[in-house]
Structure formats: C-alpha cells, structure tokens
Amino acid sequence: MSPQSGAVGGPRIVVPDVLRGVAILAMLIAHAVPFLPGAPSALNFLMDNINDVASPLFALVMGMSAQIVTQRTARAQRGQMLFQQVVRGLLLIALGLWMTEWGSWVAIVLSHLGVLLIVGAPLLLLSTRWLVVVTAAVVALGAPVNEWARSNLGWAYSDPDGPASTLAQWVVLSTHYRLTNLLPFFLLGALLLRHGFRRDALLWTMLAVAPLAWLVRPALERGQLATDVSSGSYPDTLHDVGLVFLTYVVVVVLAGVRSPGPTRVVAAVFEPLRAVGTLALSLYVLHVAMLALWAPGGVWPAENDLLGWLVIVPGTLAIGYLWWRFVGTGPVEWLMGAATGRRKPLRRPR
C-alpha cells in the first residue's frame, strides 16, 4: 500500500481475528435465541451470557484493530488515517440505519459502532499514560452519565426518529448499546494491543478479576438490594468486564501454546474462528438479511424452530468459512476498504 493510502498494511495478528470470530459467533447465537422459545432454563442462562459478551467484545476488538492501523501509519499520514476512520464510521452508521429498515428482530449495532470508531480513533493518538487516564475516566463517568440521561433527556423520546433522538440513543439512551459503555472496551482493546498478548501478571490479574466482576450483578439481583443493575449501570458493566476478560484470557493463553501436539489442536480450533472473524461485517449483514426474510416483521416463533436456528448459526458460519477458504476478503469488507481508500484484494493469496 502506498503512503498516500493511509495505514500501511502488514501481517494479520491472530488474537484479534480469533476474538472477533468469537464475537460474531456470540452475536449469531444471541440473535437466534427467538428460534428456541422453549429452551430449558440452563440453556437460556448460557445464551444470556453469550448475548452479554458479544457487543463489548466487538468494541474491544475494534479498539485493537484501530490501534493496529494507528501503529502501522506513519506520523505524517495520521491525519489522513483519521479521515479514513471517520469515513468508515459514517459508512457503518449509514449501513446500520439502512439495516434497521429490513424488519428483523435484531437491535442493529453497526451505527453504534460507527459512532464509537469516530469518537475513539482520535483518542488512540494519546500516549499510553494519558490513554489509561481517559479510559479510567470514561469507566467512572459512564454509569452516572447514563442515569442522568435517563432522568433528563426524556424530550428525546418525543420524536424517536428525529436526528437529536437518534444521536442521543447512540450515545447514551439506548437500552441495548451506548457509546458510554462501548468506549471503555474500545480503549481497553487499544491498551491491550499496545501491551502485547503476553502471559504475564496482567493476564493473570484479568483472570482473577473476571469471576469477581461477573458475580456482582447476579449477586445484587438475587439479594434484591435497592441497587441499579439495569443496562449501563456499574454492576452491568462489571458483568460485561468479567465475560470479556475471561474470553480474552482464554484466547491469549491458547495462542501462546507452543507444544507441537496441543498447537495443532489450537490451530484447528482457531482456524474457523479466524476465518469468520475476518469476515465479521459481511456475516453480520448476511445473517440479519436472512432473519428479515425468515421472519418478516420480526415476529418471534411461537414454538422451537430448530431449522431456523441451524440456518442462522452454523449455516452462517459455514458460509463464512467457505468464503474465506476459497475466496478471501468478505464482500462488505472489500467494499468498505474501497470506499475508505484502504482497498484490499478480494481473493486471498494462496
């Protein structure tokens, strides 16, 4: 890639691709939940946690990817790189707005991720010390800002389709995804990329924190204490932190395996996750389109529909793996690269 093209290309890094693959797998499972209204409680518990990890994990990997782009861009070209990131964010917003009109039951995340990229990418020009400070501040302010917004921005609901209301939803009011809660994971992803994917004290600390953070919300819910555990609250954020930390630790530990036998097993597990991770945006668009065709109007099945579940989860994954194996770059990823001046070859080098 020429210097004029912005970010300089380089070899793909395994851990972000695998994490992105886990995230798209989690999102597929979460969006296929309505196909199994009669699922047992244990399975519902598992699927609830899978649903909870999907969006913060996507934000984490987006931060890693944005940091990779920043590091591979010459300082003189970083202004152009930021422009490319803004264009990419705007395209994600536009694609997300279009997909909300398709009539699926999915709460579309792409517009939220577009806003996240536009806001988060410039912050990655900060030094690591200042980025840690900003991350801590965003974490600390997220819950009170969300609570304040719910109490004081009621006017936004008077015109739910208006631009001011839509922006408020993206930033702070949505019951599903909010900039205030996705940005900490984005910045954390960048910091982890800077630190490196090492099995060190930081990794083991994350492993120790994960179950404790995850337990806060269910403990408060079971204790029926007068504490806010709604989406965007501190307990809810800690719950997501626990899930994301555990996922990250498992992937990094497996990626660091060096013994020949276990390495082959890990490689076999990682390959399909890496494959669908590199095509995550295309697969996201594909599965929402299939859901819109399968259940027009977003009407949930009254009984278990195993065929629908199989089409959306393993079916989408199989399409993604085969495309990656025999073609290469996902079609939406290819179009996004062309539109932002970071063109990728459609066919994967053999």
Please tell me what each predicted stretch does:
Residues 1-350:
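Alpha-helical transmembrane segments and their immediate juxtamembrane cytosolic regions
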